[in-house]
């Protein structure tokens, strides 16, 4: 029997609370096929019309995830909130499945370390990350701030007065600000 071919433009989002549902909706708006999973039937029903596929499932049940073909998805986001055990076990199962890219939401730095150890490729700490971002915006001229790695960030800012109406070369921004 030939293996069914799927688009790589698919993702499974596990946990449909505020973070997971926002992320899933954004993926759908970017034409990504999204399988939204949660153990809370009310949340699943709330998003049934907006996501490509939804199901009520205990994400720590490996066989249930297999029946939903989660192992065939190239990308997964573990957006589970306060249940650390479910977050860790789910991430581990996805890693065992061989999911190519696993993002996981962590509630603390220690939780983040554990998620990385059990197979998460990318870990986000939403409240921590957003707090840093807003602090940079509050401090000054920045309109937006996104940190990529420890030493690299992308910043949208107002142009300094001395740069307005000049070319980049004339303004000497590179030498003055080290950019």
Outline where the language-model segments fall.
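Cytosolic regulatory regions of ion transport systems
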Residues: 1-179
């Amino acid at each position: 029997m030939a293996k069914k071919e799927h688009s790589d433009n698919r993702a499974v989002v596990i946990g449909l609370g505020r973070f997971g549902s926002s992320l899933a909706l954004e993926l759908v708006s970017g034409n990504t096929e999204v399988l939204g999973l949660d153990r809370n039937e009310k949340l699943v029903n709330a998003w049934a019309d907006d996501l490509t596929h939804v199901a009520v499932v205990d994400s720590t049940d490996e066989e249930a995830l297999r029946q939903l073909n989660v192992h065939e998805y190239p990308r997964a986001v573990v957006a589970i909130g306060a249940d650390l055990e479910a977050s860790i076990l789910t991430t581990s199962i996805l890693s065992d499945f061989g999911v190519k890219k696993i993002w996981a939401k962590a509630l603390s730095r220690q939780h983040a370390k554990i998620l990385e150890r059990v197979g998460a490729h990318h870990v986000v700490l939403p409240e921590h990350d957003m707090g840093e971002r807003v602090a940079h915006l509050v401090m000054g001229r920045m309109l937006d701030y996104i940190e990529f790695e420890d030493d690299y960030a992308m910043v949208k800012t107002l142009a300094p007065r001395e740069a307005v109406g000049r070319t980049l070369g004339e303004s000497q921004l590179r030498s003055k600000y080290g950019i």
